[in-house]
């Protein structure tokens, strides 16, 4: 499992004093208010202030003190150490842990690897790339087992639930 988890991406500067606008990669934007430190390219930096906006977060990060300096961080991911992440309820997983999991059906047939997790509102959908691309609804009726430690997701055979 990855040591760091991405919680946001710097998408723009904000103001002239080095604040950055962050697109959250988490379901709970309010968690940014509790963060004391983030990692950018593996380097830990303190969060000095946080302002929540409707769809973004504005952060003042230690060591970024001008608009010119902030501009250098566009498109950079903000990460946290796994041990500082939110505790997930049983049966929930971090997207970073699902990506690249091998997907097999209950008969042991290889389907492919999870390349993306799509948020649909009602349930997530796993994008699985193999011989062809398959979209797998992340629901208990289809996904029968998730083994993060062994990077394996087991699903019911495609012919049972997939329409031709």
Swiss-Prot record:
It is found in: Cytoplasm. It comes from the Bacteria. The keyword Cytoplasm applies. GO terms for molecular function: ribosome binding. Residues 90-161 form the PRC barrel domain. PANTHER family: RIBOSOME MATURATION FACTOR RIMM (PTHR33692:SF1). An accessory protein needed during the final step in the assembly of 30S ribosomal subunit, possibly for assembly of the head region. Essential for efficient processing of 16S rRNA. May be needed both before and after RbfA during the maturation of 16S rRNA. It has affinity for free ribosomal 30S subunits but not for 70S ribosomes. The PRC barrel domain binds ribosomal protein uS19. Binds ribosomal protein uS19. This is Ribosome maturation factor RimM. It comes from Clostridium botulinum (strain Langeland / NCTC 10281 / Type F).
